[in-house]
Amino acid sequence: MTESLDAERMACWRAYIESSQRLFTRLEDDLRADSDLSFADYHVLVLLSEAPGQRRRMGELADRLVFSPSRLTYQVATMRKRGLVAKEACPADRRGSEAVLTAAGLLALREAAPHHLRSVRAHLIDDLDDAEVACLTRVFERLGRRLRADRTASSTPADK
């Protein structure tokens, strides 16, 4: 049987779960009110805007978003209907495809970004001092590295 968490660690876990859900919901609500973009829409647009040529392979984009391939396909399809992204064959490998940021998608991102930044500041960043920002950055970067490594290890066939 798995050992239970002590009271301090249980309080940490529960505080994280509730606050992260509330934060995500608030950021999502603010984004939709200010821009008619979902959080997933916004994240796709950001990742494409930062990529060389404003395009990414679908598999890489799914990995960065922590989406299943089918979820990303659906997400990109809904964004294509709204003209925010295009889907094109990968120039280097015609079997693969890439999501590509459109001019309309870039405009939507540029219009939404200041509102989203205000929301992030209001609901998270401005409530933290410099030491707390540094601590959270260390904790979540370490956690992200470990979870990415765990995911990579679990998706790689074991050597026989």
Per-region residue spans from a language model:
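N-terminal leader segment of winged-helix/HTH proteins
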Residues: 1-35, 130, 134, 160
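A cross-family signal for key residues in well-ordered alpha-helices
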Residues: 14, 46, 110, 137
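Alpha-helical linker/hinge and terminal dimerization helices associated
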Residues: 23, 27, 65, 108-127, ...
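Short, hydrophobic-biased segments on the C-terminal half of alpha helices
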Residues: 58, 76-77
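Charged, amphipathic alpha-helical coiled-coil/dimerization segments
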Residues: 77-135
